[in-house]
Design a protein with these regions (language model features):
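Nucleotide-sugar-dependent
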Residues: 18-22, 279-284, 291-314, 321-331
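Nucleotide-activated donor-binding/catalytic signature segment of Leloir-type glycosyltransferases, i.e.
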Residues: 258-285
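Membrane-proximal helix-turn-helix segments that form the acceptor-binding/catalytic region
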Residues: 27, 95-102, 123-124, 148-167
Length: 384
């Protein structure tokens, strides 16, 4: 008799229904096709839940399959002001997860962590083993702005690294720079929902009406429009050099600082249209003449492995990007440009491309799909 795959309790960093899914949601949804998953969303307080129309008892309406279970833990507000409240919230979180695990009859699950801040969950849930998924250089993120915050993150990450049976790292360079090598460490770069974004190539997929109204040619971006990641100055300067091109940014503005609206992007040919439902994104990307990854180059982004690269390529769209190390492996399928003048020139040049590289883009995306990546990860889990 084949042994049933071990259940997973995932301490997630994003809500499962977040309109801009990351590898956290993509990975767990696909693992739930083969094994049971308890997806523990970031804790919130009851006031937030009532305002958002969520069930204040900690349940959620998201139920993607019989194997995917979602818990929205409830904690007390003001933890950032009080160490006592923060400690109490940690106990509340553990208690709620334990209760749900008992209800689901999870026995010795895999504990899957996505942040060093989750170190306090280790050894509290009766887990058989810990899997740690490193997606970023966490100490370089906006939430670690002070030396004390960075020091805590480093210490917490050491705790997680020591406990983890498997460490999955999305950036090869991050693994090399941090010396994360050996049998426990697995470089698993980000990939894309190729089938979903490949829908942009199908004749029956119609361009979204608001994109058709903007008109082309369109240089487009999908993702969080935030100053810590997007080089607004470069984008604005490139847009001023190309008044004939519509620059369209699709996604929430100001994730790190929601009050931030980039004034430098208030240009007649720049359109910030806000987030759109994930299911409808192929109809938006279909309107792109060129796709953009205009990231700042800094301590955080130099280790980024953008999912959007393969999302764009799956739609057959040419890509212009700043010089992120992870993008260099795509070769001539991505045009690298590091200053406003060369970025504007690169976008114009991509507009003149014929479809000679389209199939190569699609083929590269197909080699970097979630279906392939899940096979790799499942093989690692089954060997242990």
């Amino acid at each position: 008799m084949t042994e049933r795959p071990r259940d997973i309790v995932c301490i997630a960093t994003r809500r499962l229904d977040n309109p801009m899914p990351t590898n956290v949601q993509h990975l767990m949804l696909r693992l739930a096709e083969r094994r049971r998953v308890l997806y523990v969303e970031p804790p919130v307080d009851p006031v937030f839940l009532v305002r958002r129309g969520r069930d204040p008892r900690g349940e959620t309406a998201v139920q993607t399959s019989s194997r995917m279970h979602v818990l929205s833990p409830i904690v007390l507000p003001w933890a950032h002001r009080s160490k006592a409240i923060a400690a109490l919230n940690q106990r509340l979180l553990v208690a709620q997860v334990r209760r749900r695990l008992r209800r689901l009859a999870f026995e010795r699950p895999l504990l899957w962590l996505f942040s060093p801040r989750q170190a306090g969950m280790i050894g509290r849930l009766g887990e058989a083993a810990v899997c740690y998924h490193i997606t970023d250089d966490y100490k370089a993120m906006p939430g670690a702005a002070t030396a004390a915050a960075r020091s805590r993150l480093v210490a917490d990450e050491q705790t997680v690294l020591q406990a983890a049976r498997h460490v999955f790292i999305t950036s090869r360079r991050l693994a090399e720079d941090r010396g994360l090598s050996g049998e426990r460490f697995h470089v698993i770069p980000n990939v894309a929902d190729v089938d979903h974004f490949g829908a942009a190539l199908r004749p029956e997929t119609r361009v979204a009406e608001e994109m058709a109204a903007i008109g082309g040619p369109i240089a487009g971006f999908v993702g969080a429009v935030d100053d810590y990641k997007i080089d607004f100055e470069l984008l604005a300067a490139a847009a001023r050099r190309t008044p004939e091109i519509s620059w369209v940014l699709i996604g929430p503005v100001g994730w790190a600082d929601p009050t931030t609206v980039p004034p430098q992007l208030r240009l007649p040919n720049v359109h910030l249209i806000g987030p759109r439902p994930y299911r409808s994104l192929p109809a938006y990307v279909k309107a792109f003449s060129v796709a953009l990854i205009p990231y700042r180059i800094n301590e955080y982004t130099r280790y980024c492995s953008p999912l959007k690269l393969y999302e764009y390529l799956a739609a057959g769209v040419g890509v212009v990007a700043t010089d992120l190390p992870a993008l260099r492996e795509a070769g001539d399928l991505v045009t690298i440009a590091s200053d406003p003048e060369s970025f504007a020139v690169a976008v114009r040049t991509r507009l003149e491309d014929d479809d000679g590289l389209r199939q190569a883009r699609i083929d590269l995306a197909a080699r970097n799909s979630w279906s392939r990546r899940i096979e790799e990860i499942e093989a690692i889990l089954c060997e242990s």
